[in-house]
Amino acid sequence: MCSLEELELWNMIKHKAQKILKKEPILSNFYQKSILNHKKLSHSLSCILSDKLSTSMISEKDIYNIFNKIYANNISIINSVVKDIKAASQRDPVVKHYLTPLLYLKGFHALEAYRLSHYLWNIKRYELSAYLQSRISTVFSVDIHPAASIGSGIMLDHATGIVIGEGVIIENDVSIFHSVTLGGTGSNTGKNRHPIIRKNVTIGAGAKILGNIEVGQGVKVGAGSIVLKNIPPFVTVVGVPAKIIKKIKNSNKNLFQKEKK
């Protein structure tokens, strides 16, 4: 059963797809298979992801059925999908419609595939989860350990080269750019060797956040920075090693969020 928020989003996506096909009929097969043949957002996303992650050894149909079953029994995952689509649409200036993340943004695809692998990990289907992690890394160049904990309203922008380790915790409404590493320092081997990223954090391209540390709410991490120590909330940090350069006004608004018209 669809939530009202999912249903409204899905109807907007389908309507946009129909309008686009009038201008670009050559995309008919792609749009029919990916969007217009489906009654639900979850069915569409299962189709898109299974097409990208299948191999000659595990078929598209088998992966589609696995994903569809997970979505059918876990409304919370679909709720996160909806929030992720909206996050990309609100924060990425090149995204003009909700259809764009669903069809074209590999950061979104990698994130939603991770959510499915995370579910499988949590029910102890470790081998299938590991298979999906490997395929996600190969196809999207994004390496997220299925045991990592990631909230909703997440944007992985460009996404190439993002690495998120096993013990990482990411709260809601976080934006992460390409080539970011959230990992360990190599000095600890326990599960608590990775960072915690609080809500509304923005992590610039190429930044590395390493070790059992906490990045506070609303922090902005500059591109290329290396963070090795706890960062208090509502500051901007840059440099190697990262240092605080200014304080930020307490706000729940993400740095790149577009104003509503």
Curated annotation (Swiss-Prot):
Pfam families membership: Hexapep, SATase_N
InterPro entries the UniProt entry points to: Hexapep, Hexapep_transf_CS, LbH_SAT, Ser_AcTrfase_N, Ser_AcTrfase_N_sf, Ser_O-AcTrfase, Serine_acetyltransferase, Trimer_LpxA-like_sf
Protein name from the UniProt record: Serine acetyltransferase
GO terms for MF: serine O-acetyltransferase activity
Listed EC numbers: 2.3.1.30
GO biological process: cysteine biosynthetic process from serine
Main location: cytoplasm
Keyword annotations of the record: Acyltransferase, Amino-acid biosynthesis, Cysteine biosynthesis, Cytoplasm, Repeat, Transferase
Gene Ontology CC terms, in alphabetical order: cytoplasm
Translocase in keyword set: no
NCBIfam families referenced in this protein's UniProt entry, alphabetically: cysE, EPS_EpsC
Pathway involvement of the protein, from the record: Amino-acid biosynthesis; L-cysteine biosynthesis; L-cysteine from L-serine: step 1/2
Catalytic activity: L-serine + acetyl-CoA = O-acetyl-L-serine + CoA
